[in-house]
């Protein structure tokens, strides 16, 4: 089963950064839940952990909500990962394998080291990326993917067509 805590928390953090840039001071857990395609209780659990680790702050109650606790440029993706994953291993070997040969006997130790190395490399990568830089990259992807769609739509409806009209 795929663990979606990190991508969901990252989407929440990116949404809060975007909201801040658009002049929306706070978002409710219900609003964020709609955006991430989840239920508010799941979002609140993630927000509680992010708040505990100083990544978001909020106001409780009917008119409350959450926002980033620091500027988006000062929050790394590694901080978000560590906050919501809470130190659990990235992967783990099966424990129910009978020890019959060199592979099955040492698989657990080998896989633990492999997992540790992979997670260290991933955290190095995530440490070099911030919420702000990630939002910038998303904007760039949006521009790249939206431009061809806009051009195709304008051709379909005849915008920018300098040739004779068929109407």
Where are these regions (language model features)?
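A short alpha-helical element within helix-turn-helix/winged-helix DNA-binding domains
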Residues: 26-37
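Basic amphipathic alpha-helical segments that dock to polyanions
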Residues: 46-53
């Amino acid at each position: 089963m795929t663990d979606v805590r990190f991508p969901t928390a990252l989407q929440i953090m990116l949404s809060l950064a975007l909201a801040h840039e658009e002049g929306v001071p706070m978002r409710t857990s219900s609003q964020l839940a709609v955006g991430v395609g989840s239920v508010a209780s799941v979002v609140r659990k993630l927000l509680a952990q992010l708040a505990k680790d100083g990544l978001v702050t909020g106001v409780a109650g009917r008119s409350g909500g959450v926002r980033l606790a620091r500027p988006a440029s000062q929050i790394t993706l590694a901080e978000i990962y560590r906050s919501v994953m809470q130190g659990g291993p990235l992967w783990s070997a099966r424990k129910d394998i009978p020890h019959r040969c060199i592979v099955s006997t040492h698989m657990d130790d080998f896989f633990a080291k492999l997992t540790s190395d992979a997670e260290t490399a991933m955290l190095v990568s995530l440490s070099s990326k911030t919420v702000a830089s990630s939002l910038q990259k998303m904007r760039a992807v949006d521009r790249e993917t939206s431009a061809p769609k806009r051009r195709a739509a304008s051709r379909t409806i005849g915008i920018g067509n300098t040739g004779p009209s068929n109407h």
